[in-house]
Amino acid sequence: FLGGLMKAFPALICAVTKKC
């Protein structure tokens, strides 16, 4: 679970901040 969370976190930040 933790590994998946770390993998999804950057994508979440990208979606929220629109900075990819």
Curated annotation (Swiss-Prot):
| UniProt entry keywords in alphabetical sequence | Amphibian defense peptide, Antibiotic, Antimicrobial, Disulfide bond, Fungicide, Secreted
Q: Which cysteines are joined by disulfide bonds?
A: 14-20
Grouped into one coarse class, the protein's main location is: secreted
Protein localization: Secreted
Q: Which GO terms describe its biological process?
A: defense response to bacterium; defense response to fungus; killing of cells of another organism
Does this entry carry the keyword Transmembrane?
no
Q: Return the GO cellular component terms, semicolon-separated.
A: extracellular region
Q: Which Pfam families match?
A: Antimicrobial_1
Tissue range of expression?
Expressed by the skin glands.
Spell out the InterPro entries in the cross-references.
Answer: Antimicrobial_frog_1
Similarity field: Belongs to the frog skin active peptide (FSAP) family. Brevinin subfamily.
Biological role: Antibacterial activity against Gram-positive bacterium S.aureus (MIC=17 uM) and Gram-negative bacterium E.coli (MIC=4 uM). Has activity against C.albicans (MIC=14 uM).
Q: What is this protein called?
A: Ranalexin-1Ca
Organism of derivation: Lithobates clamitans
Q: What is the lineage of its organism?
A: Eukaryota, Metazoa, Chordata, Craniata, Vertebrata
